Amino acid sequence: MTFQSLILGPALPEILLAVLGLVLLMVGVFRKTDSTGLVGLLAVYGLLMALAVVGLGAAPETPQLAFGGLFIDDGFARYAKALTLLGAVLTLLLSMVWLKRENEGRFEFPILVLFATIGMMMMISANDLIALYMGLELQSLALYVIAAYQRDNLKSTEAGLKYFVLGALASGLLLYGMSLVYGFAGTTRFDGLAQVAAAEGGISTGLLIGIVFIIAGLAFKVSAVPFHMWAPDVYEGAPTPVTAFFAVAPKIAALTLFARVMMGPFAAYADQWQQVIILISILSMLLGGFAAIVQTNIKRLMAYSSIGHVGYALIGIAAGTTEGVRGVLVYLAIYLFMNVGTFTVILAMRQKGRAVEGINDLAGLSKQHPMMAAAMAVFMFSMAGVPPLAGFFGKFYVFMAAVNSGLFALAVIGVLSSVVAAFYYLRIIKLMYFDEATEPLDALSGTTMKVILIGTAAVVALFFLAPSVVVDGAQAAAEALTFASAR
């Protein structure tokens, strides 16, 4: 490995965050007074600085490599990192409100979020199976800890333990798949794997089995069926801001990694893996739709809703085209704002100063807090795919990608599962506007939560006025991915 191959410029945002994380650890340890607020504020500034580096700099015309080719910087990575960093900033701001309100402040929390975000960014820019695994595990180790952040809360401890045990199993599947791929292809580099595929013209059974194991490991990380079993319990048991973080940033990073792996090194084998992705997508959409209907806890409902949304996003990957990748990226951008806004409302659900999570606790919300009810209605209508809200456009682009790729049955199943899912979204709206409250919710307090709620609701409601802001960026990012894959 030459000095030239160790150029670090493409990894500048990750390096900045890593240095900041180490500095904040020392600040937290050596500062005598409680440093949670200071460390949290500096972590937010650091994430915003990384977002500025990612978003303001022009994406390279050709992919830039670092660390001997293990790390890649291209337009696709820039777009996905911008979404991941934005999700991390918004959920960390919500977390700081919760930490102060619940008197749960410990300086390690924002640092763990910081390191989890670094892992996600490494995943997005992975250009090698080993780099992919390192990023994935850095993210996972931090997430295991924050899932069990409330050490004295039985549900939180259970959530962390379940996520850890099942996550270790998924990591084992992923590693086994990587070992098979390396054994049969002779390389772990993405460009090397693509060259092997082009040279052989076919696929060996061992390599195919390895790809299936890799898909299984990645499916766990995005909570796709049948590897979803951890999501409902972890979403319900983890602290609400942690659940919000789980539902947004790691999901975006893992789905974009999924797209890079399938459309990069394994693009030539699309005929083989496409059927697996289609099956996972259908199962996720159907389970996410039907299982959520019977839920009474809103965080558990959001877990199944998230599983359904993963199914819709996987439609774009199953399409196996630039248009499909664009659909996934548009969907994830919209999903980010819908979910952050919804979890802001969930975090605000309190009765006499006590947090509540029952869906029925939203009854009569429109009479008590009309602004909060209106914002929640916007998010629910959008998740149901009602035009002209943003959620409609997200589903439209992935369904169109499926149709243009000849996957008519998959698109039809997606539309039908959207109709099923609309039932539980509209049920929440019915509760807020047509039912009477047994006990009123406390008023929404705090400027941070109000700004996030109004901002996310405005983006979701007014997206149709300027969809090109997101769609054009997604198109350029998708073209960058397919260009890199074709090299």
UniProtKB/Swiss-Prot annotation:
Main subcellular location: membrane
Keyword Transmembrane found: yes
Entry GO MF terms: NADH dehydrogenase (ubiquinone) activity; NADH:ubiquinone reductase (non-electrogenic) activity; quinone binding
GO biological process, one term: ATP synthesis coupled electron transport
Source organism superkingdom: Bacteria
Record field: transmembrane: 7-27, 38-58, 79-99, 111-131, 164-184, 207-227, 238-258, 276-296, 301-321, 328-348, 373-393, 406-426, 451-471
Function comment: NDH-1 shuttles electrons from NADH, via FMN and iron-sulfur (Fe-S) centers, to quinones in the respiratory chain. The immediate electron acceptor for the enzyme in this species is believed to be ubiquinone. Couples the redox reaction to proton translocation (for every two electrons transferred, four hydrogen ions are translocated across the cytoplasmic membrane), and thus conserves the redox energy in a proton gradient.
Name the record gives this protein: NADH-quinone oxidoreductase subunit N
Organism: Rhodospirillum rubrum (strain ATCC 11170 / ATH 1.1.1 / DSM 467 / LMG 4362 / NCIMB 8255 / S1)
